[in-house]
UniProtKB/Swiss-Prot annotation:
The keyword Mitochondrion does not apply. It comes from Nocardioides sp. (strain ATCC BAA-499 / JS614). This is Uracil phosphoribosyltransferase. 5-phospho-alpha-D-ribose 1-diphosphate binds at residues 78, 103, 130-138, 203. Uracil binds at residues 197, 202-204. The lineage of its organism: Bacteria, Bacillati, Actinomycetota, Actinomycetes, Propionibacteriales.
């Protein structure tokens, strides 16, 4: 597994405003959207392309286009939905699948409650959208779900990550014969006793959409 922390002043600027507890939900959604687009630029450096011949107003030339099968973008519900538009801005022709996962706040274990994905993901590059890589349980379960269906290349885009979550991913994905890359805006200090990232930005889903009881 490879972890890439994006070092860019605009990324740091937007992340700082996301962290601020005074940032309201509409502003938080806009900043998250902008930040994901910046992260997506780094995350798609290995996106597969194929050659294509085109004719410019001056002469014929050879360029590239996204290879088939097209990439699959998979937001983890619900907070991952807040990252979808920012990702699709760079990959408008990608397919979108959905994976609903929930974390038990007592055991910190993740379980799947909904999915809308192709049955066969053989040969597919998958981009998983999960704003907070905290304990790592949700993302590990999502990656296993995708690889069980044949995905052969997975990149996860996270607004924030914690060292404990990355360590758990390394452990749970050990022996997995599929390249996995984590792209994040920051590696924070630690998790607290409730499994939240410190200093973090709070609950991403609540801050995106408001608290739903």
């Amino acid at each position: 597994m490879r972890t890439h922390v994006v070092d860019h002043p605009l990324v740091a600027h937007k992340l700082t405003h996301l962290r601020n507890e005074e940032t309201d939900s509409p502003t938080f959604r806009r900043l998250a959207d902008e930040l994901v687009t910046l992260l997506a630029y780094e995350a798609t450096r290995d996106v597969r392309v194929e050659p294509i011949d085109v004719v410019t107003p001056v002469s014929p030339t050879t360029g590239v286009q996204l290879a088939k099968p097209r990439p699959l973008v998979v937001p983890i519900l619900r907070a991952g939905l807040g990252m979808l538009d920012g990702m699709m801005r760079l990959l408008p022709t990608a397919e979108v699948g959905f994976l609903g996962m929930i974390r038990n706040e007592e055991t910190l274990q993740a379980s799947t409650y909904a999915e809308r994905l192709p049955e066969d993901l053989s040969g597919r590059q998958c981009y998983v959208l999960d704003p907070m890589l905290a304990t790592g349980g949700t993302l590990a379960a999502a990656i296993r779900f995708l690889t069980d269906r044949g995905a052969d290349h997975i990149t996860a885009i996270c607004l924030l990550a914690a060292p404990e979550g990355c360590a758990r991913l390394e452990q749970e994905l050990d022996g997995l014969d599929v390249p996995v890359t984590i792209v994040t805006a920051a590696m924070d200090e630690r998790l607290n006793e409730k499994g939240y990232i410190v200093p973090g930005l709070g609950d991403a889903g609540d801050r995106l959409y408001g608290i739903v009881g």
